[in-house]
Amino acid sequence: MDVLVGSTGLIGQVLREAHEFGACFHSKNIHEAPLLKEPIERLYLACMPAEKWKANAAPLDDFDNMNSIIQNIRHLPSPAEVIVYSTIDVHGQTAYYAGGIPEIFAIDYGANRYIFEMLVKAAFRDSVVTIIRLPALFHRFIKKNILFDLLTNNNVEKININSAYQWYCLDDLWKDTKKAISGTTNQFFPAPIETAEIIRRFFPEANVSSGPRIEYNIGTYTATRYETMKKMEAFINAWH
């Protein structure tokens, strides 16, 4: 049986569209997870909240939530495999990555999610654990990020045009999950795209601001800027 934890979040919703799970858990029923007794083939963990601003504003609350999740899942029957959906932010910002995790974390959101990765490995020592790290996301299920704000004209004036993000289309998630399970790669970081380029091409009327530089540029790239922009264009056109 395959089990999904985090079934109502963004990634969880995408996974449920692509695959049938024998059991699904979310924040309202996660306390029932330890009651599961059936053998688990694969355990998919998409349960860490993605609200970076909230985690950075209250990192201790974020840590406590993470610990609560671990306590609820650690008593599950030992699965053959565990797949953890994590974030580019474990690497920090403004550096080209070609090796390990930095010793000093740039932000608490990333630090807590790296700790979560390690706690999962410790909790399931007899399982094969695959960590899948993703950057900024776009999909019809998104509820909050720069693209969502531009599409819904929400707090556009707070968007920092002096930024570059690596964007990933969640339509590829299940295909790439299978790649990660097979050992091909586990980090899906396309080439970075300047926010200014996105606004110039798709939202030329947006009245944005400019602040301190924010840049994500972590390789090795799994898609070109052109490939990502084509997918982003299709996503934006479908949204409208």
Q: How would you describe each model-predicted region?
A:
Residues 106, 114, 118-174:
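NAD(P)-dependent short-chain dehydrogenase/reductase
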Residues 14-15, 53-55, 92-96, 141-143, ...:
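Short glycine-/acidic-enriched loop or helix-start segments at secondary-structure transitions
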Residues 8-10, 47-52, 88-91, 136-139, ...:
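Short, solvent-exposed loop/turn segments at secondary-structure junctions
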Residues 32-82, 88-96:
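NAD(P)H-binding glycine-rich loop region in Rossmannoid oxidoreductase-like domains
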Residues 45, 82-84, 130-136:
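Structural signature of the Rossmann-like NAD(P)-dependent dehydrogenase/reductase core
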Residues 174-219, 223-240:
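Mid/C-terminal beta-alpha module of Rossmann-like enzyme folds, strongest
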Residues 1-25:
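N-terminal Rossmann NAD(P)H-binding glycine-rich loop of SDR-like oxidoreductase domains
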Residues 21-37, 46, 209-211:
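A short beta-strand-loop structural module common to alpha/beta enzyme folds
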